[in-house]
Amino acid sequence: MLKEFEIEPLLKDKVPHQTKAVVAMSGGVDSSVAAVLLHRLGYQVIGVTLQLYGADGNSNTRKKGVCCAGQDIYDAKRVAEGTGFPHYILNYEEIFKKEVIESFAQTYIQGKTPIPCIKCNQTVKFRDLLQVTRNLGADVLITGHYVRRLEKNGEVKLCRGIDKSKDQSYFLFATTKEQLKLLRFPLGGFYKCNVRKLARYFSLPISEKPDSQDICFVSENYSKTIAKLAPQSIQKGKIVDVNGKVLGEHNGIVNFTVGQRKGLGIAYSEPLYVVRINTKNNEIVVGPVNALMQRKILVKELNWLEQPKKGMEVTVKLRSLHSGSLAKIYPAKEQNKAYVILNDDYFSISPGQACVAYKDEQVIGGGWICS
């Protein structure tokens, strides 16, 4: 059966048994299959799992659909021990709290909609795990992400995964060229259903484990999590229309996101949506659907894997499930910012989300939406 799952050699100048590979193991099916597959192919596999929260017993260790705590750490260790390769657990709770959880809360307090999974990949999982990889004297860092790394004539490209329903390239736009030198994604050329089959073929105890879905550290809902982290942020304020007319009262801006319709708590003659969040005045601004249609986007903190030319035509994704919109990219006057001009109006562009640009299957790069 392994012949059906051929992968490119991890290194062109080393055979498998000479190649040391650190595998980031979350305790889920994907990273477990990646680790066991490489072990079966003869690579020197070292499993590493980061404990990101829950050591104090007060966090989300038993919630289903999350990763990197409690049962998931046990599952990763069980897979490694059952297969016969070393496995290490590293406590990264303090770093995760600072880089991801506190950033998540602060972004909401600023009236934006964060994506903590991108921040986690950008910092803890890639920046820090790549350093662990170097410290262990390993050649490559492996993850179970559904993306592809293509290399030709010394140029490395990051591309969408073959399985479009599982493609995770949007979440990896902040990956740098330097990081791609050591990163490998062996599952990018597979469909998830076949990865499940491989897990069963390997008789892995987690073969039927459901995919992680939720924000791992949010135990109930995000506003309650933020209230615990920053209770001072939960302050009542006004709900106003686009002309400034007071329509009602809100119980804290962290309970609202741009584009939200439900839960506004006001009656009106037509459907109203959150158009913007005015943190300075602690106001929620609402309006009709056409007030949320937008074509021009300002993007900051850019990371380009291929530097776009002025006016370059691309496809952009403005949220993870967005199928993509045609657009052109132009440099902004401010450093490390750019304007993305969509061909057509788009509904509800949320500050704090990522704007990721593609050229066909290749990830060109992206940044964070300002406005």
UniProtKB/Swiss-Prot annotation:
It is found in: Cytoplasm. One of its GO terms (cellular component) is cytoplasm. Its EC number is 2.8.1.13. It catalyses: S-sulfanyl-L-cysteinyl-[protein] + uridine(34) in tRNA + AH2 + ATP = 2-thiouridine(34) in tRNA + L-cysteinyl-[protein] + A + AMP + diphosphate + H(+). Keywords: ATP-binding, Cytoplasm, Disulfide bond, Nucleotide-binding, RNA-binding, Transferase, tRNA processing, tRNA-binding. The active site is at C120 (nucleophile), C216 (cysteine persulfide intermediate). Disulfide bonds join C120-C216. CDD domains: MnmA_TRMU-like. It is an enzyme of class 2 (transferase). The record marks H145, Q353 as: Interaction with tRNA. One of its GO terms (biological process) is tRNA wobble position uridine thiolation. Catalyzes the 2-thiolation of uridine at the wobble position (U34) of tRNA, leading to the formation of s(2)U34. Belongs to the MnmA/TRMU family. This is tRNA-specific 2-thiouridylase MnmA. It comes from Wolbachia sp. subsp. Brugia malayi (strain TRS). The lineage of its organism: Bacteria, Pseudomonadati, Pseudomonadota, Alphaproteobacteria, Rickettsiales. The gene is mnmA.
